[in-house]
Amino acid sequence: MSVITSNPWLMVLAIFIINVAYVTCLTMRTILTLKGYRYVAAIVSFLEVLVYVVGLGMVMSSLDQIQNVFAYAFGFSIGIIVGMKIEEKLALGYTVVNVTSSEYELDLPRQLRDLGYGVTHNTAYGRDGKRLILQILTPRRFEFKLIDTIKQIDEKAFIVAYEPRQIHGGFWAKGVRSKKLKQYDTDEVESI
């Protein structure tokens, strides 16, 4: 530790790296808590506090060095970005995708079901007449693939995606058919 404290550049680098690690843990813990992964969040919070105490101690022992304060602040902002990127890659949870289409002849519900998605659909009436409304629940890691697939089939579709708070029963109670969802390529999907 004395090697780090004796070299101002190593001190700045150490504070930056420690704060990136701390805030990454903080961001992940917050996201895990919001998504209901309480035990994983508790483990991450343990690591978070360990890293925080070390980093804060280093900064507090050398507050007279402005570069250390800047390294701490810069590490904080980068840590948020890193934490969010990790969460994007993990893609925890599910997404509900609502689709409104005027193209009945495309048989969008059947095409999506053939690809492994659970689809609930009904008819609604908008300003310009009859519309097909679809509601599709998918694991978040397949959200963009599903949206790309819908755009391939019906480029005029109106699409809204959001995260549900709770899921009970239905298609997903029987088990997610992730294997089938992974197997197709969106470039190979064609409309009828």
UniProtKB/Swiss-Prot annotation:
Cystine pairings recorded for this chain: none
Localisation: Cell membrane
UniProt KW Lipid biosynthesis keyword: no
Top-rank taxon, per record: Bacteria
Lipid bilayer topology: Multi-pass membrane protein
Any one annotated GO CC term: plasma membrane
The entry's keywords: Cell membrane, Membrane, Transmembrane, Transmembrane helix
InterPro entries: DUF2179, DUF5698, UPF0316
A Pfam family it matches: DUF2179
Parts of the chain that traverse the membrane: 8-28, 40-60, 66-86
Main localization category: membrane
Family to which this protein belongs: Belongs to the UPF0316 family.
Protein name, as recorded: UPF0316 protein SSP0880
Source taxonomy: Bacteria, Bacillati, Bacillota, Bacilli, Bacillales
